[in-house]
């Protein structure tokens, strides 16, 4: 992890860097971070993460985040690209104090779309648990079996779209920002936002890798500005 100098109006930035260039089958990656009371931080990656084809074992990623009272945490990595044959198991566990705020995004691209690669074989599971004051606020499990075509190609799955993203805002006033995103995305398919319970806003996107990234960037700018009280722009690492 590197700590580049933030812009004058930004929170401290932590850059998560994989010096190996990617993850292979059998690799295990664990990250833990705690923000104390009233602290602010933005966590980003400097580039897309790559998960290579596996010869059998899963790649395992575990992220554990904790935010104390009045803390504001942004988890904003760039895309994770699953090469054909990759096997990724990922877990995210976030614990928030009563008035802590969280903005989190995760984007998955199935196959190296720039090389016209299709994700024909492989496995992906994504496990989210979000806690507020020790009580479960949100739980989500996504599992893509091997072979993945029956989910990726199905009309009630990804409908042959190669990319998907999740956006999470946990804040006491989360519902106030739903209509801002709906207005931004009102003429677009494959993008939706909802408030499943008080204090939680969820966005879901599917589409091409380019369209999904554009939608995530739009949401990040809106939510960083209005919900996280930050600058009206993307993190600098997203632009480098």
UniProtKB/Swiss-Prot annotation:
User: What InterPro entries does the record point to?
Assistant: UreD
Any one of the GO CC terms: cytoplasm
User: What Gene Ontology molecular function terms does this protein carry?
Assistant: nickel cation binding
Q: Where in the cell is it found?
A: Cytoplasm
Q: Which Pfam families match?
A: UreD
Q: How does it assemble?
A: UreD, UreF and UreG form a complex that acts as a GTP-hydrolysis-dependent molecular chaperone, activating the urease apoprotein by helping to assemble the nickel containing metallocenter of UreC. The UreE protein probably delivers the nickel.
Q: What family, per the record?
A: Belongs to the UreD family.
Function summary: Required for maturation of urease via the functional incorporation of the urease nickel metallocenter.
Name assigned to this protein: Urease accessory protein UreD
Q: Which organism is it from?
A: Granulibacter bethesdensis (strain ATCC BAA-1260 / CGDNIH1)
